[in-house]
Swiss-Prot record:
Positions of transmembrane segments: 8-24
Top-level EC class as recorded in UniProt: oxidoreductase
Name used for this protein in its record: Cytochrome P450 monooxygenase ecdH
Lineage of origin: Eukaryota, Fungi, Dikarya, Ascomycota, Pezizomycotina
Cofactors, names only: heme
Domain of life: Eukaryota
Organism of origin: Aspergillus rugulosus (Emericella rugulosa)
Amino acid sequence: MEFPLYTTTLLCGVISSTLLLLLLNKLTTWEHIVPSKVPWIDRRSEPFGYLRAKCRSFFNMKENITEAYYAFNKEGRAAALAIAFGRPQIILPPKYIRWIIDQPESVLSIDPIHNEFHAFVRDGLVGDHLVQEVLRRELAGHLAHLTREMNEEIADSVESVLGVSKEWATVPLRDSMRIIIARISNRLFVGKELCRNEDYIRNAVGLGMAVMPQTLVQDLLPQLLKGPLSFATKLFTRITLAGLSGHLSPVVRQRIQDVQTAEKDQLPLELLTWMAQRALQRGESATSIEEKLIARIAMANLASIETTTNTITKCMEDMTALSNETGGYLELMRQEAHTVLEACNYSPIKADLEKLVHIENALKESLRLAVVFPGLIRQVTSRTGVTLDDGTHLPHGARISVAAYAIHRDDANWTDAARYDPSRHEKASLPMSRGSEQLLSFGLGKRACPGRFFVTDELKLLFAHILTKYEFKVIKPPVTKVGLLKELTMRGPQEQLVIRRVK
């Protein structure tokens, strides 16, 4: 029996497409990296099961982490999760927290994860960790000398974005906070002139929105196709970087010249200065140093803007949504802010920020409940892998973490853990910038978030200005289905901030 030509062609096409899909599925999955004895969460017996689990994880990450924690981690066992952005993660029980942070870089490291994000900005940044080094050392070490600049930018940006009207007005909460955070961050990154340039800030904010979809698409590509297809997947990032470069190039060139010729004590205390100093000390090529410094400033923006925006937004939501329970605490925060800022005539020094205890407690509590991902993520860097004390062997390239989201909500760690209660931190001796095995918002150990000291000062002072000058409440958007593209580009429905100036 003979088949018509079009039928044969169609059949061959279906078979070829099926084989191609199966091959792509094999090339893009990392299931082989998870030991067979480790159980999976939400990995079903279905065609393309791993890829489908990755897609579902974008919407049910919290539930998956909770199941891994209570069904397996609490029993001392590991569990595997498919992750929308990146390789699957093996969620280890909390008893391994100290073990994770004590391992040398030759055994476990976060650098391979950083490298993937560096590649989204510039291929030449893979393996370059100068941004983290400068944030951890120079920025943290100079914060006491930067409080004045930070305070000045907070006051100006809050007034510019939130307004001065004593009539109630409504503004988008997240977008407003994003601009304020971008301005404060860039005041310390590149100086006053650029941080108040609206087009520069628009590009700095847009970088995160351009990179997020790219992280998902690139992870689904086989390794052999990542290079050839990276041009397409990085298109929007390149457009945004071009906008940043137009503003940054002359500033970067001038700063390189200043570092080479000016006295050290005459150089501005900024991230760009310290990066230029280190780059020149390394002997970086004159043909690439400018591009690398621009890319590093972009990386600093990518690392700081969205995460800090999430924290201040979450805290303002918490204080509004639970006002019946925390109304008294909100008044304590407001009184504290008035006392501290009025005593220094709204020109605080570093020591004044240490007095904002109630505000720090509120931020710390919001950080505790804001975490939605696993924490202490590391990749096995030992070529021979590493073996846990229960005999589970983790091969080279495997990624491990702990269930930070669930740890923060475990009643065994926190009384009435699901409840937002800033007063629970009143007796805590640890500052917001330091973590514990029960509070992993900034990570823990020597590889904890390098910008945590800056973020702590920034958010405390920002909240103090808002509390002393405004009345506000947050209105949540109606519950609607949001498309994946809007989620990825952070353009879904957002909370509205109803606000008026009172001082």
